[in-house]
């Protein structure tokens, strides 16, 4: 009996260390000045590609926040975490909505994650939504918020977020999809890129999937309504139809997984991407990792 108790307490101790010790031992403070190399999400994808026999290169180009189009920054905040500068890591309204949807559907599908939570997951954890991983994510989110500035959290997120198979970070995404640096993304291009973040392997910013059309339309509409879009785009806007907010279509998801709910909009004709050539005259760090 005594042996069983010892085994039980050892098991509990190991479990608690895995649950709490791992996220507490990670060196989060190094992120103040150092850019992470391979993230947990990148490693996870590399294992997937190896298992599937795919030869995929990780394309990532580090870029400072001040070299990213303000339209892209605003579009991502609108799409993923509109309360980013107001909360301390958690959007409890978003979590409440996610829980209600999970209970309604009977499975852990929605997470209500903020940008800080997504960064914690991308850097250190697996994509799993099991309770243990969510607790670890919460601990890491608190540590990130207490250690890093909001500006640095946003900069890290935009540089490690997944934007397609092997494409990580906004600079690599801007060059891959639009042939330009992230600094020169237009409002419409920014809206399209932000729209696919919830599931970048399923959705393509250059495609015509109804979900992407509606979500990017919404993001663009909000940017216009808030006065984010500058005057030079007014002539282009005059050529488009008036923006309206229709009722959501029956079979179309109103929001992406892991983000607070948003309404949907009707599609808008896509603007042609600028022909400006990609700029490489600022401090960037390009990384290509080929899956063995």
Could you say what each language-model-derived stretch is?
Residues 2-292:
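Juxtamembrane regions of bacterial inner-membrane/periplasmic proteins
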């Amino acid at each position: 009996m005594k042996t069983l108790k010892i085994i039980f307490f050892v098991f509990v101790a190991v479990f608690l260390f895995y649950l709490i010790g791992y996220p507490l031992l990670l060196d989060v403070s190094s992120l103040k000045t150092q850019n992470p190399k391979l993230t947990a999400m990148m490693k996870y994808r590399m294992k997937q590609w190896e298992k599937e026999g795919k030869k995929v290169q990780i394309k990532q180009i580090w870029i400072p926040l001040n070299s990213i189009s303000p339209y892209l920054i605003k579009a991502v905040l609108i799409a993923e975490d509109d309360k980013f500068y107001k909360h301390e890591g958690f959007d409890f309204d978003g979590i409440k909505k996610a829980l209600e949807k999970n209970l309604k559907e009977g499975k852990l599908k929605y997470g209500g994650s903020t940008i800080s939570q997504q960064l914690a997951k991308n850097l250190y954890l697996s994509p799993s939504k099991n309770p243990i991983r969510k607790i670890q994510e919460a601990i890491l989110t608190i540590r990130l918020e207490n250690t890093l500035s909001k500006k640095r959290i946003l900069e890290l997120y935009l540089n490690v977020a997944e934007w397609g198979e092997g494409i990580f970070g906004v600079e690599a995404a801007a060059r891959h999809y639009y042939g330009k640096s992230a600094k020169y993304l237009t409002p419409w291009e920014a809206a399209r890129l932000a729209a696919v973040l919830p599931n970048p392997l399923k959705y393509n910013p250059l495609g015509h999937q109804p979900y992407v059309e509606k979500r990017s339309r919404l993001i663009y509409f909000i940017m216009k309504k808030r006065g984010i879009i500058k005057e030079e785009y007014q002539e282009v806007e005059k050529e488009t139809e008036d923006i309206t907010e229709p009722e959501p279509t029956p079979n179309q998801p109103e929001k992406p997984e892991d983000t607070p709910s948003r309404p949907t909009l009707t599609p808008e004709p896509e603007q042609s991407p600028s022909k400006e050539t990609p700029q490489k005259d600022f401090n960037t760090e390009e990384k290509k990792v080929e899956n063995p």
